[in-house]
Design a protein with these regions (language model features):
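Serine-dependent protease modules
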Residues: 1-133
Length: 133
């Protein structure tokens, strides 16, 4: 979203709404956007359980602008230490599910559809996982 305070949000049904950026973290490449629409489905958060190494992880996003893309893999690590561009060490869920530019901010979910994380980084020499077909 850069420094924009208003963004266009495209819903799964194709509707486009103007959204207000209420928070953003450039180091994680994610933002929280408020839209004025009620009755939208909400993805449940897996707050009661921690992801486990080996469990299936499903990544949702729009890599390279390909809306509503789903990829899958497994959880490879649950507390991988990463040093951000700001020098801050944070922990992350590592998965081998293909993540590419455009997946940032999308959900990482378990097979029950519960959100276990947010896609926000890729470790790659090329900058992408490619393999989108």
């Amino acid at each position: 979203v850069g420094s924009d305070q208003q963004v266009t949000v495209r819903l799964a049904d194709g509707d486009q709404l103007t959204g207000q950026v209420v928070g953003a973290d450039t180091n994680s490449d994610i933002a929280v956007v408020k839209i004025d629409r009620t009755g939208l489905p909400v993805a449940p958060l897996a707050l009661d359980t921690q992801p486990e190494v080996g469990q299936t992880a499903v990544a949702l996003g729009s890599p390279y602008g390909l809306a509503q893309t789903v990829t899958a893999g497994v959880v490879s690590a649950t507390e991988r230490a990463l040093v951000g561009s700001d020098g801050v060490v944070r922990t992350a869920i590592q998965t081998d599910a293909p993540i590419n530019p455009g997946n940032s901010g999308g959900a990482l979910a378990d097979l029950d559809g519960q959100v276990i994380g947010i896609n926000d980084a890729i470790f790659s020499e090329s900058g992408g996982n490619e393999g989108v077909g």
